[in-house]
Amino acid sequence: MQYQLLINGVLVDGEGERQSVYNPATGEVILEIAEASPAQVDAAVLAADSAFAEWGQTTPKARAECLLKLADSIEQNALEFARLESQNCGKPLHCVINDEIPAIVDVFRFFAGAARCLSGLAAGEYLEGHTSMIRRDPIGVVASIAPWNYPLMMAAWKLAPALAAGNCVVIKPSEITPLTALKLAALAKDIFPPGVLNVLFGRGQTVGDVLTGHEKVRMVSLTGSIATGEHILRHTAPAIKRTHMELGGKAPVIVFDDADLDAVAQGVRTFGFYNAGQDCTAACRIYAQRGIYDALVEKLGNAVSSLKMGTPEDESTELGPLSSLAHLKRVTAAVEEAKALSHIRVITGGSQTEGKGYYFAPTLLADARQEDAIVQREVFGPVVSITVFDDEDQVLRWANDSRYGLASSVWTQDVGRAHRLSARLQYGCTWINTHFMLVSEMPHGGQKQSGYGKDMSLYGLEDYTLVRHIMVKH
């Protein structure tokens, strides 16, 4: 099993404190990995800074060729990547193989093509005797911090656009789920020039702070919690670094009385509980119009209770464990707080399961109120609440009454209503009669405290570039 860091094109052992990496399906230790030392973090950043002088000047075609080689290599090693991700995260193996790996490969291939399409605007003469041009240039060294819910996919979302734009990257995966990023490092070292891509391991306070605070790092890209985002912004503010933040969500799912309730129930069953609900866009905050509320509660209860929990290796498993014991405790505490409210009804689930591993039963909580914590806070687990509403204005007000602004969906047969709400919902993405669906060509990112900047799409590529004005006198 690959456990070494990638620094300046060489795989090396960490020199810092050793940390245990767990299998969440069993609670057992997979292996121990040594963190990067401060000196190794410094070496990785300096290697990236040195490599940028040449990599930043390579042609888009040359960068695209490297990204395509990496995509091919991931595809060729798909089963090994899937097994590592499943073992380290507890994800059902078939979900990683069939859903995640193809999407990861596609992200690298998309940005390989996008790199060759990015250009500055050809301008003209805005001052007599002078011609202006616009360039889009790479930023420099990017520090990327990837989360533990989709370790390899989020690494791909960060690496592909940054490298395609001509930046050099030092990435730190979560210390909870580092195995696929470290495997990726072993493949990347034979594809990219030394220093272009560096992969470290360690905790935020020992490695992340040193990395993001390094004077040679010009941009920090984070997918994580609001608290982590706040910390990084405070930490990097004195150096005025560029930042790219995706900080979670609490997606409202608005169901009107003309919606297809069977489609809603099956949609929430999938989109609310995929990856054990550990997804920033999870369909977790349901608003149902009064006329269909009781019927939807019943249908959702039946759908959610039919989800099959099991071991990641079982092809029939739909719901795996949560990623860590600490997170299991957080999810349990959030549900217990909700259950303590006299008006909350537990339709199904509501507790962790017996036996080994960090499993929490798929949970549906009915009669939640707008002010309840279960409606306002991100649980990031297999927990969905449902709240009754009366009219369009009320539900729009409630849906926007959130510090989050990442994703939302509207379920209705009224096209006009769908357009009205999607125009007024304060979310980076609004789906109509579906949820959760993402493609490489379209941007993903939030507003409000869900952060700023876009992943995927040409907008994501542009986020990793600088706009520069060139003026020529003639």
Curated annotation (Swiss-Prot):
Further details from the record: 4-aminobutanal can spontaneously cyclize to 1-pyrroline, and 5-aminopentanal to 1-piperideine.
Positions bound to NAD(+): 146-148, 172-175, 209, 225-228, 280
Gene Ontology MF term list: aminobutyraldehyde dehydrogenase (NAD+) activity; NAD binding
GN (gene name): patD
Name this polypeptide is given: Gamma-aminobutyraldehyde dehydrogenase
The keyword NAD belongs to this UniProt entry's keyword annotation: yes
A Gene Ontology biological process term: putrescine catabolic process
CDD domains, sorted: ALDH_ABALDH-YdcW
Keywords attached to this entry: NAD, Oxidoreductase
PROSITE patterns according to UniProt: ALDEHYDE_DEHYDR_GLU (PS00687)
Species, as recorded: Salmonella paratyphi B (strain ATCC BAA-1250 / SPB7)
Top-level lineage group: Bacteria
This enzyme's EC code(s): 1.2.1.19, 1.2.1.-
